[in-house]
Amino acid sequence: MAEISTARGSLVAIVTPMSDDGALDLGALRRLIDWHIEQGTDGIVIVGTTGESPTVNFDEHCLLIRTAVEQAGGRVPVIAGTGANSTSEAIALTECARAAGAQAGLSVVPYYNKPTQEGLYQHYRKIAEAVDLPLILYNVPGRTVADLANDTAVRLAEVPGIVGLKDATGNMERAADLVRRVPKGFALYSGDDASALPFMLLGGHGVISVTANVAPRLMHEMCVAAFEGNLARARECNDALLPLHSKLFVEANPIPVKWACAELGLIPPGLRLPLTPLSGGQHEVVRAAMRHAELI
């Protein structure tokens, strides 16, 4: 089991900038990565759910990974979303990430086809055996239906090349069980912003964050405070962020967070169908959460 010791803290699940017609805006992506690094973001997670991975094609997916790795230039780790509900496609995307120079692949639990726990084990083991790139598992049953059980995750933690897990269940009992059972050095990341602070206090390595798209400095400072045991500062940051954690999900992610990024002038407002722009009635809801965090 390899170790990604550098990928610790606030890792942004970065949005994919697009023009009004849905074309990729690579220039905006490069500027966005520079801004995140300036703001203290500890790592870039490219082409995940928040990056609209379901609606980019294979060539675009690889192009986005290459662009992120090139722009980051080794300043922060780049973790590439490489998951698919086809094992062969997941292998191909992971190989693309390896060739681009990403530090790791983030592979979501296969969605729609509802594999068994043994199927999940074989899927991930096959990817790890096929590609020489550290692999982080990603469990988000609210989207995938299939749920990677802790027993299966612990079993996979022993497979060479599988180095971590993003847990988006928000279940602290499950998180505590994982922290207790996985090998030392196996990286555990919260995939749920609202419970990221308790997750880290239990022993997690950080958060792969939607909220960090608009509040990177606060998310970074919260992580630093948590790791240093400065609970007063960690709570202060978390209190400022809490409305964002909920209001950035008033419609399906990444609809609200892309609107918020555009509101801050970071990106153009484009999305790809079937995602549509944030409903007008939700604009002030998200804006109020941004004001609470003193972003505007």
Swiss-Prot record:
GO molecular function, one term: 4-hydroxy-tetrahydrodipicolinate synthase activity
CDD domains: DHDPS
Pathway: Amino-acid biosynthesis; L-lysine biosynthesis via DAP pathway; (S)-tetrahydrodipicolinate from L-aspartate: step 3/4
Gene3D superfamilies listed in its UniProt record: Aldolase class I
Catalytic residues as annotated in Swiss-Prot or TrEMBL: Y138, K166
Binding site for pyruvate: T50, I208
Site (Part of a proton relay during catalysis): T49, Y112
One cellular component term from this protein's GO annotations in UniProt: cytosol
Keywords for the protein's UniProt record, in alphabetical order: Amino-acid biosynthesis, Cytoplasm, Diaminopimelate biosynthesis, Lyase, Lysine biosynthesis, Schiff base
Function: Catalyzes the condensation of (S)-aspartate-beta-semialdehyde [(S)-ASA] and pyruvate to 4-hydroxy-tetrahydrodipicolinate (HTPA).
Homology family: Belongs to the DapA family.
Subunit structure: Homotetramer; dimer of dimers.
Protein name stated in the entry: 4-hydroxy-tetrahydrodipicolinate synthase
